[in-house]
């Protein structure tokens, strides 16, 4: 347990930081915003919030002092030039004026060299240093252009800004230097630290609870945008893109989904962020002073590229167990977990049906009502018939039709891109390696037949996933870069019809090597655990712990907010006060074991209905945090979206596959035979069954039931801690099931 951190101490600390910074009232006209919380959060006591947010006000001198302190022209940071990358990297600077943990609340920026004339070291506006390392401010060349590797054209005023979100497993991310990864693309690359689960102050006080990770990333966005507006950094404030993998993918998603929503302003204000200030009447000011004029500053984003986004946690226990239970052949390790999954699956059906979801066929590209056209808006529901749909434990419906269509399309897309494979080894039906000329002559149909029958051994262009676990980001050069990995993600032994374990999914059993629930580990109970709980001796004790923890959370944090609801992006997509991104893409591995595919499906549905161009891909064979494969990349997608949505930009079309002209060097086929799961017709279209898709999904199962608010506290529990506890139970749906079915579950618990 940690000591309680007093709000009074926070106020005093903030005042001490700002003392002497000036008290002259700002006369600027500023925009005011009233907070609009999600429905689940309305009616909470906001008295603590009102008291806290009067600390930093636009009417006092605090606005001016914060803006002065966070102006890079006053900081004069260190810049280092990389000749090989032709890029300038800024040393780490603190992004706020009231940092609790400065080593975790900093920012570094990497800038393409073409946009920079040099470093002004004495403030006269001219470039004094053009290479090496120097402290000062950049002299920006706004006439220079960079043509990306995909053919898009950018300038210092129009370049996208990539914000890399860390937060591995929702953990703290220490400050790090921005990588040169995107310099050749013409992008500005931003690395930022963040507080997170298990973060503590020097006195031992716990400070890692939500929404600290997300708030620090929002503050980094504000800092960089502010300095772009000042002319201290190149880049466009209109084209910020978040990216990250796993826990980082969750935060990339949440950063975009909650763009500039006022529910987070109080937390940003408390940290001393730029461009968000409280007014004495309870409203907010969200402008900064640029050349004597007030300019709106937002923490909103233009786009999002998330890999294995582990969000929304509020839905995650239901979605994972629904997917488990959808596979009527899945073997749970205990009767308690099986029964709990059955109950949570029923809760998920009720949850989806109560939302009244719809989707436009034209937006998803699927004929869901079977009328031969893509003109309908279809209601998405889950239905139940235990006799007619026994192979999926009774579940079916239009919502699951969409789920299956996404699954089929993801496999179809994978097969359609096999022409981009460069170093695979292809075999005939008898196991003989094809000659180079035979490989060069392969048609799309030939490759599809070989793939579905498992007549191949992958090369590096088909390896798609990391080794699993809750990563911070998708890999690459320092902070920021495309994902990389070396696992194929095929179904494990016995999962597919052939029982072929050809490079199966990564080992994602997070709870197999560390003790669950220890403060330093924070791991998740694995799917192969035969014990329901090692910490609770009885179901009654377990239930009491859930009731006490969730009551604390629902009572609200220091600002009166339910932190679980704050961290639910579904609450904010399309909500009043949210600036929705123009586009979003979520790439999941189809054999992902750390979260259900239904979570990304729900995000896509919500974003599409809110007007965001939202795409999801469940990469076949991909495990946790899949790599981009077959010619795809973050840069290709960003450039394509830029060409689609920015007037005058280049329309980007993916380069055609060169085709493989020489066979690989493997000596035997290691592919998985999918013909027992997938039908492939003469027109090159494939179909699957819902039960087959569910069986494929459970083949990569890595978590017990429940998978997120785990009974012995897991890695995702720590982000919902408090000032006195670094982990708490938080899933009110799990608690509902425990209460309603206590008689049945108590007899099965730990049996």
Regions from the PLM with identified roles:
Residues 135-141, 151-167, 241, 584-585:
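Short beta-strand element of the alpha/beta-hydrolase
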Residues 55-104, 261-476, 515-575, 696-745:
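Accessory cap/linker subdomain of secreted extracellular hydrolases
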